């Protein structure tokens, strides 16, 4: 009974969420697009000509937003064909519906086959920006969840170290709580500038936050 009440409350909040309504109106697949939008507007992350990699991209709202920023011309409809000034590669182990001008690679980005496909798309270019909205399936056990969250951040950090330009940036999702300070410390070891970000589009009750690292300390 309590679970049903929880589901009803969640559904009510979701339906009445202004970001959900905005996403539906503007053609985004998820409200998460507005988290990236707010951070991008604050930090000027996405610029014409960039190479951007979106880790854990499904369902694709972050790639949609990045695509819109790189779209040529004044009109930036979410699914408008017409090319972009830059390259976007989206990766996920789950399938994703196609997005115009976005290269999607399905598979684990730690595997050689997927990395080979990525290298073919990049054509020898380093990456300007890595974005990751990845989140584990949470169990409710704090220690286990902290380890899973930290693991995903570690994967993103390793990927960034191997593919970013020296002045590139990495934006990842994490959660306040056990293990958060360790994640921040790892970012500080790898990047010259590290800053937390809590966009308004993040739900008030959520411990979700984002960490932005810029300028590698030890480029490849």
Swiss-Prot record:
The keyword rRNA processing applies. Its main location: cytoplasm. Keywords: Cytoplasm, Methyltransferase, rRNA processing, S-adenosyl-L-methionine, Transferase. It is found in: Cytoplasm. InterPro entries: RNA_methyltr_RlmE (IPR050082), RNA_MeTrfase_FtsJ_dom (IPR002877), rRNA-MeTfrase_E (IPR015507), SAM-dependent_MTases_sf (IPR029063). S-adenosyl-L-methionine binds at residues 60, 62, 92, 108, 133. The active site is at residue 173. It is an enzyme of class 2 (transferase). Pfam families: FtsJ. It catalyses: uridine(2552) in 23S rRNA + S-adenosyl-L-methionine = 2'-O-methyluridine(2552) in 23S rRNA + S-adenosyl-L-homocysteine + H(+). GO terms for molecular function: rRNA (uridine-2'-O-)-methyltransferase activity. Residues 195-220 are annotated as: Disordered. Its EC number is 2.1.1.166. GO terms for cellular component: cytoplasm. It comes from the Bacteria. Belongs to the class I-like SAM-binding methyltransferase superfamily. RNA methyltransferase RlmE family. Specifically methylates the uridine in position 2552 of 23S rRNA at the 2'-O position of the ribose in the fully assembled 50S ribosomal subunit. This is Ribosomal RNA large subunit methyltransferase E. The lineage of its organism: Bacteria, Pseudomonadati, Pseudomonadota, Betaproteobacteria, Burkholderiales. The gene is rlmE.
């Amino acid at each position: 009974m309590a679970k049903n009440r929880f589901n009803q409350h969640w559904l009510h909040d979701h339906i009445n969420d202004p970001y959900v309504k905005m996403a539906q109106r503007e053609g985004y697949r998820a409200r998460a697009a507005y988290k990236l939008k707010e951070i991008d507007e604050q930090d000027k992350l996405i610029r014409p000509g960039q190479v951007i990699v979106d880790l854990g991209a499904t369902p694709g709202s972050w790639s949609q937003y990045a695509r819109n920023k790189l779209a040529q011309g004044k009109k930036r409809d979410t699914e408008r064909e017409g090319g972009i000034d830059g390259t976007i590669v989206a990766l996920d182990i789950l399938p994703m519906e196609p997005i115009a001008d976005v290269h999607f690679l399905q598979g684990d980005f730690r595997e050689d086959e997927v990395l080979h496909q990525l290298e073919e798309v990049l054509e020898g270019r380093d990456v300007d920006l890595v974005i990751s909205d990845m989140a584990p399936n949470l169990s409710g056990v704090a220690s286990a969840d902290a380890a899973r969250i930290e693991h995903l951040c570690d994967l993103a950090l390793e990927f960034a170290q191997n593919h970013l330009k020296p002045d590139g940036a990495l934006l990842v999702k994490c959660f306040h709580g056990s293990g958060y300070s360790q994640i921040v410390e790892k970012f500080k070891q790898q990047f010259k500038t590290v800053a937390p970000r809590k966009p308004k589009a993040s739900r008030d009750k959520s411990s979700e936050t984002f960490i932005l690292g810029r300028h590698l300390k030890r480029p490849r």
